[in-house]
Amino acid sequence: MDKIKMTTPLVEMDGDEMTRILWKIIKDELLLPFIDLNTEYYDLGLEHRNETDDQVTVDSANATKKYGVAVKCATITPNAARMTEYNLKEMWKSPNGTIRAMLDGTVFRAPIVVKGIEPCVKNWKKPITIARHAYGDVYKASEMKIPGPGKCELVYTAEDGTETRELIHNFTGAGVVQGQHNLNDSIESFARSCFSYALSTRQDLWFATKDTISKKYDHTFKDIFQEIFDAEYKEKFEEAGITYFYTLIDDAVARVMKAEGGFIWACKNYDGDVMSDMVATAFGSLSMMTSVLVSPNGYYEYEAAH
């Protein structure tokens, strides 16, 4: 039997622990007998990331930009216990976070619905697709442990040297602080990806943040989505017979539990991380979930939903 030829290499990102074994089985039994497999290999196992000071993660993302498509296995994001177990140089950041930031894409996750596996939520009749923003927020945050009393501020230094300061907290004792960021360009790409995907699949689009509490950070997401929708997609949605709906994240969770499904739920990075697991498990299993990172520049990274 002639094998299928590959003219362009596939970026292969190996992972940690059992994923390395499972990926090898998949290649040996399902791919290599039928495909003349052509891949550019990157070992994203924690030990190799530590050896390369995490440069291998950056290299794999750049290779994805070069070749267009990557397949990634699940990887370990180290905590304090893993630091000791693997004797790490430092607590390396999430490879997914690094790759998603470099590709600046949107993660679309949808349950694989099959007969015989009924959703735990009885009124769910159709798949619920989670569109997760793949840049910034807690995944690219800087953190600091505060040892004792003192003042913590956000400081923005403009190119001309002028400073803008915002008080975070006057600490009277030990604590912790975290600084998050996002980019308008990335939020705009996220919004356009979601609106375009909704049109191509003819599904309603929901979006939710907590703008009533986060009046600048989350409100920026809300405003950008609405501006792009009104300027570029409103008429297209009306012609397609679909709707765009914004609400608060807590209200969205309540509405999702009562809905029948059949829509796309756009979420910020952390919300999408959590809610995609909830939706996947309620539909049957996290392993019965597709996951693809779609970049506005046409790059695709397929990974196991985990």
Question: What is each stretch, according to the model?
Answer:
Residues 43-46, 218-265, 274, 298-300:
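Active-site rim loops that border cofactor/substrate pockets in soluble metabolic enzymes
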Residues 22-24, 82-85, 140-145, 216-221, ...:
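Short acidic, glycine/serine/threonine-rich loops at helix termini
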Residues 256-306:
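Glycine-rich phosphate/nucleotide-binding loop
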